[in-house]
Amino acid sequence: MAIINMSDLDLQGKRVLIREDLNVPVSNGVVTSDARLRASLPTIELALAKGAAVMVMSHLGRPTEGEYNSEFSMQPVVDYLAKALSCTVRLATDYLDGVEVAVGEVVVFENVRFNKGEKKNDEALSKKMAALCDVYVMDAFGTAHRAEASTNGVGLHAPIACAGPLLAQELEALGKALDNPARPLVAIVGGSKVSTKLTVLESLSGIVDQLVVGGGIANTFIAAAGHNVGKSLYEADLIDEAKRLVANAQSRGGDIPVPTDVVVAGEFSPTAAATLKAVNEVADSDMIFDIGPDSAEALAKIIESAGTIVWNGPVGVFEFDQFGEGTKRIAQAIADSKAFSIAGGGDTLAAVDKYDIADKVSYISTGGGAFLEFLEGKELPAVAMLKQRGA
């Protein structure tokens, strides 16, 4: 079943409603990280170039559903888009019963989560949204894993439902990385907890040639290998699970390497003193916050030989520079690699920005949870809806 692409449609004079993922951090009314906004611009610009009257909607943050809260208003996003686009951009706060929008203009709807029924994919709300447009464009890969009114229901009731260029690119890149990858396929999975990424680790361990774990996840694997992890964040109840994943990888001729050296401190703080230790020398009072240089070099070598690289999650607490060298080395190795590389997840994108490698990564995914669910092998509800409407 083919998905209809926005780029193939005649949008002249049409009311086009685009669901983007504009969920960006805002501080004192100003957007502090604009990666998702930048990613959405080509879609909005294409709709304008095709002669459409453009409406854009998104969620921002986690407000109480159905209640207006100025802290989660889309106004800072409107201010950003007004500077980035060469046209009128305005905010519509009361839009469900109809909104005036002219060709060549962009109207941004107030936070979709201010609407009661958004998260439950309420049918009445979905139909009201669908009635606002001639063409609905799903372009928010970051929320494609949620069946909500603005990402799923509206598409079922709109006259035409299609994928925007950003979503189409995401699906193509992920397919290239996982469906028919150039091998060896190396996956780097970081983050704080095994429990949140267990299904990802299980799914990937069956298809990758080499699985690398980092961050708090690695601590559980270090403990599973019989080493002391001191006061580090780890999950004792998942040690057997970690052992099983390692055994599975080894039975396929791969491995999940455990760091040989680590960077530790006595407290979690931006000023904590970093100490390098062999992994078997971690004391009861230590907390592991990064991999050491030997481990980082070993991982860099694995990355150098890869044909395809999937990166989701840092290997240390890179927000603090003294615990960022491991992630920095991984980032450099990915940047230097000739392999097809795809990076996704909020913390990963922050690392890509910090180490300035965005132009060296083949594809940067805007999705967090959606990226993970795709890695788990699940069909995303928004994609299922688009396939249904394209049939």
From Swiss-Prot:
Pfam families: PGK. It comes from the Bacteria. Keywords: ATP-binding, Cytoplasm, Glycolysis, Kinase, Nucleotide-binding, Transferase. Pathway: Carbohydrate degradation; glycolysis; pyruvate from D-glyceraldehyde 3-phosphate: step 2/5. It catalyses: (2R)-3-phosphoglycerate + ATP = (2R)-3-phospho-glyceroyl phosphate + ADP. It is found in: Cytoplasm. GO terms for cellular component: cytosol. Its EC number is 2.7.2.3. ATP binds at K197, E319, G345, G346, D347, T348. Substrate binds at D21, L22, N23, R36, H59, L60, G61, R62, R113, R146. Its main location: cytoplasm. GO terms for biological process: gluconeogenesis; glycolytic process. GO terms for molecular function: ADP binding; ATP binding; phosphoglycerate kinase activity. Monomer. Belongs to the phosphoglycerate kinase family. This is Phosphoglycerate kinase.
